[in-house]
Every structure is written in structure tokens, then in C-alpha cells.
Regions:
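Hydrophobic alpha-helical segments, especially transmembrane helices
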Residues: 6-8, 132, 177
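Surface-exposed strand-loop-strand hairpins of Gram-negative outer-membrane beta-barrel proteins
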Residues: 39-68, 151-157
Length: 219
């Protein structure tokens, strides 16, 4: 995963450096902007606990929504194709899941941090465009367990596809409306509690649907 993030960073720096070549004409094709996003997320969580050599398995599907801001920068290599990188400004935190056992509440939630997307926009007729990208995100767990244990933080990757409409003014200022869907790789975290009983949590079938309004300027 760290190698994947490094590759994204290298690609991002490479195309931004290319866009920033020391000549005024190099600014042409550069786009910067901000977005307001509203997303719905879903996934299936499965907890497996090893109790005296016997697995206790609990599985549950959940959904939640979130709104957040993001910034993006793009470079147009032609009238039809541009490459961009987008970074969430806000972390996304799941609702807290509470499980009462032995008259004690166990609470677990997760926060998606450093959500970064490297993407390509392909322009189509009637001011529309098709978006295809790859995602890298960190998943930090926050738990309060009666065993005193804790889960490790993890990270994951994903793919996103979307469609958008772009309206550009004469001065290069633009407004976009975009809808996209994302699919994330499965993740798992392990908790070795002081009582010696190992627990594993897997989150599978993670998906997201996002509607966004974007504003910016193209040079």
C-alpha cells in the first residue's frame, strides 16, 4: 500500500511539475478548483472472535452519509483529455457501533483519512465528461473495548468512475455538476486482547456514491 501511495505521489508531482514549466505558456491547460461533496457509503462488517478455539462470527451491513469539501488540480494534455488529483479536506467518520456484552458497552468506529484520488477526465459532447480514477485512503479505528484491546489502523485502495457536466465562462471560470461511484478494496484489522482471545474485523463490499458541485478556473 505504501508503494502504491508513493506511485500516486510521484505521478502527481510529475504532472504538476510538467504543468509548472518555467514559461507563461505552460500555465495554459492548468485547472484549479474546489468541490462540495455529498456521499453515501455502504459496507459489510464481519467480526470473528476466537473463544477457546471456537470462532464466534457476527456480520452486519451498514450505510451512512457524509458531506465534505475537497480541492483539486488538473492539467489538460489536449482538448479531450486531462489528468487530475483531488484531496478531501475533511475526514469521514462512520457512525459508532455499540455492542453490549457482559453488561459493558463495546464501541467501534472508523475514520477515513487522507482520501486522495488520481483521475482522468475524458471530454464528451454537450459539455459532458467521463471520469476514471484510483483512490488511496487511510482507515483509522477508534474503539473502546471492555477487554482493553484495540484494532490496528489500516489503509485501502479503490476505483472510481463518474459522469459530469462542465459549464465554462469566457474568463475560464467554470461550474461542474458531477456524480460518481466508488468501489474500495476489502480491509481487515486484528485485535489481540489481554485475555488472549484474538478478534478480527473485516469490512467488505465497500462502495460509495457521490454528488458534487465543483467550481474553479482553467488557464
Amino acid at each position: 500500500m505504501n508503494k502504491f501511495k508513493t506511485k500516486i505521489a510521484v505521478l502527481a508531482i510529475s504532472f504538476l511539475s510538467f504543468a509548472g514549466i518555467q514559461s507563461a505558456s505552460a500555465i495554459e491547460g492548468l485547472t484549479i478548483g474546489a468541490a462540495l461533496n455529498y456521499s453515501g457509503f455502504g459496507g459489510t462488517g464481519t467480526e470473528t472472535k476466537d473463544v477457546a478455539g471456537t470462532d464466534e462470527i457476527v456480520s452486519e451491513h451498514g450505510v451512512f452519509d457524509a458531506d465534505y469539501a475537497s480541492l483539486f488540480v488538473e492539467y489538460a494534455f489536449s482538448d479531450a483529455f486531462s489528468l487530475g488529483i483531488e484531496r478531501h479536506l475533511d475526514d469521514i467518520t462512520t457512525p459508532t457501533n455499540t455492542n453490549t456484552k457482559n453488561q459493558s458497552d463495546n464501541t467501534v468506529k472508523a475514520t477515513f483519512e487522507n482520501h486522495t484520488t488520481l483521475y482522468a477526465n475524458i471530454n464528451m459532447p454537450f459539455n459532458t465528461y467521463f471520469k476514471l480514477g484510483v483512490i488511496a485512503v487511510d482507515v483509522a479505528t477508534q474503539e473502546n473495548l471492555n477487554t482493553g484491546g484495540s484494532y490496528n489502523n489500516v489503509d485501502t485502495t479503490g476505483l472510481t468512475v463518474g459522469l459530469g457536466y462542465n459549464l465554462t465562462m469566457d474568463n475560464g471560470v467554470f461550474v461542474r455538476a458531477e456524480i460518481s461511484g466508488s468501489d474500495y478494496d476489502d480491509v481487515s484489522a486484528t485485535n489481540q486482547s489481554p485475555d488472549g482471545n484474538a478478534q478480527e474485523v473485516k469490512v467488505t463490499d465497500m462502495i460509495g456514491v457521490t454528488a458534487a458541485i465543483k467550481v474553479g478556473k482553467s488557464f
